[in-house]
């Protein structure tokens, strides 16, 4: 029946249109998450230039709060993506062959997860540098302890976890695997009794080059 085929074709077109719209929303959401972290970093650079001590202190507190908000949003998103990637990795080769769209979705989640790791690290660094500017090192230690908990909860201290992300991503990022392996080792070995004011920069390093939020599906 031609009319039935026409209706079915229209429905399939509409489903594909909705799928494209959802992917566009996803890209916008990921860009918003990354922009939060970038905004906190920009605020830190600007706050350092404020001459008035009281205004600088108020601005620095705003920097810290912005960095914490960005960090938490990215951490939650990373954990959700990591859950789906782990579930996907347990499928058989045959199941994966039958689920092409799922494979593409997992690749997007892996790309997002790598981006999130870099920006989470940068957000923690922003938090710590903000507290250091205020001469408050105890909350800085707390930030590092929270980061350590995140790393351990997501098994990011295990290189295999990072390699799983890389394996499922269409954009191979072995350099991020190497960098974060090093960061995770230092953070998990961090001694909270250490002189934190001398070690923040050594503990936290991550590059943002080539980790832009734009999707490869645009």
Per-region residue spans from a language model:
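Amphipathic, membrane-active segments
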Residues: 4-65
């Amino acid at each position: 029946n031609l009319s039935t085929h026409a209706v079915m074709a229209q429905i399939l077109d509409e489903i594909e249109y909705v799928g494209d719209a959802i992917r566009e929303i996803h890209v916008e959401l990921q860009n918003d998450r990354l922009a939060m972290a970038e905004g906190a970093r920009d605020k830190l650079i600007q706050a350092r230039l404020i001459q008035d001590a009281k205004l600088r202190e108020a601005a620095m507190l705003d920097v810290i709060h912005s960095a914490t908000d960005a960090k938490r949003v990215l951490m939650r998103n990373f954990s959700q993506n990591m859950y789906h990637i782990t579930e996907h990795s347990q499928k058989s080769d045959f199941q994966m062959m039958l689920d092409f769209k799922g494979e593409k979705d997992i690749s997007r989640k892996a790309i997002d997860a790598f981006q999130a790791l870099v920006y989470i690290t940068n957000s923690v660094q922003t938090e710590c540098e903000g507290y250091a500017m205020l001469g408050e090192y105890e909350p800085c230690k707390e930030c590092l302890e929270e980061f350590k908990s995140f790393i351990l909860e997501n098994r990011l201290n295990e290189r295999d976890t990072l390699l799983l992300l890389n394996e499922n991503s269409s954009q191979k990022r072995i350099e991020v695997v190497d960098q974060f392996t090093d960061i995770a080792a230092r953070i998990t070995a961090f001694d909270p009794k250490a002189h934190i004011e001398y070690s923040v920069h050594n503990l936290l390093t991550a590059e943002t080059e080539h980790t832009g939020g734009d999707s490869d599906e645009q």
